[in-house]
């Protein structure tokens, strides 16, 4: 990890080098450093115990400590990225058999606002100029960094520009909403027309909801499943308790007037032969009465008569 640390130098010494810049009486210079290790802080590291546990392998490698000669521990001085010094007491706890940094650590946690999951990095200087100097840095955990990004970077979804506007948008009175969505770069699709009984309520809901939604979004597509085409319903006519679906071109032909003939003192109602073959469904004629043989032979092939005893 590369650290940039301000170094205090006299003004006369800083004036001779081009790599050193003065800023408010302090000169900034790049110091070569060696990264030692990282420690992801736990809830107990940033809790009320006010101590940071150093992993044993890193503690024995970089901060060797003789517990017999240093019962109270050592004071380690660090510099952060701004050059601010930090001093921690480093010691070994026999109860937990761990290496910890205690005094001064709680102040570092409060100032840097460390939370569980954040990472603390430790480094040391390299070369004659930075020999014996220790450095400390920190960074947020990845999920916090992602949460701080603007929502457009995390949830942006670019839709293809080939999706057209719905051709039925202007038929529902949403021309203004579609125009507003087009100006904002949104894809504004409206559902097809439904039954007339819900048309008034649907228009009112769409006029309120879609206009506000089109103004709030910059690029949005709304899809609706098309409704099946409406079927043509014909009124059903019931004749003699039999449902019949009436269609055009099948009207009942007008009935021709019947003929009445008086034969041998008996009145006969005679119907035309064409009317016998074009009877209407549902109408039944009374059963014919037997006629005398002489009358049936004389009227054969001309008309069928029924007796009407109207004496």
Curated annotation (Swiss-Prot):
Main location: nucleus
Annotated region described as Disordered, given as residue ranges: 275-311
One Pfam family linked to the record: B3
InterPro entries linked to this entry: B3_DNA-bd, DNA-bd_pseudobarrel_sf, LEC2-like
Compartments, record wording: Nucleus
A cellular component term, taken from the record's GO annotations: nucleus
UniProt keyword annotations, A-Z: DNA-binding, Nucleus, Transcription, Transcription regulation
Ranges annotated as DNA-binding: 37-142
A Gene Ontology molecular function term of the record: DNA-binding transcription factor activity
Family annotation (PANTHER family): B3 DOMAIN-CONTAINING PROTEIN OS02G0455900-RELATED (PTHR31140:SF139), B3 DOMAIN-CONTAINING TRANSCRIPTION FACTOR ABI3 (PTHR31140)
Name of the protein in its database record: B3 domain-containing protein Os03g0120900
